[in-house]
């Protein structure tokens, strides 16, 4: 069993992760689990494209690894936002004013995702940022 924690920048969490624990509360929980000897995965997924996303995600990575002992981490996952066309249709009906559901995504095999140029830019940026703290062989991508 691997205990996984999804972590987002504070701005993204405040806007889109209603009723979820704050990002730094998740980091504290991850720390406690690691201190208890449990394998922990940090998930920087789904990455949300927003104003100053580079700054938001860069600060988040620095904040996370100022508190987490990377040598105790099992691994790290990275992935940009993607969603099934059926679920996005439901979300658009339920939350018509949300910027996330109104983005002009590409539909690839029934799943909406950011256009390739945005997606690859975000994911490559995060791999680079996280690899300053974690060996690349412990970083994997969700596709």
Report the location of each language-model feature.
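Conserved AdoMet/S-adenosylmethionine-binding subsite of the radical SAM
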Residues: 1-100
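C-terminal accessory extensions appended to soluble enzyme cores
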Residues: 78-83, 89-143
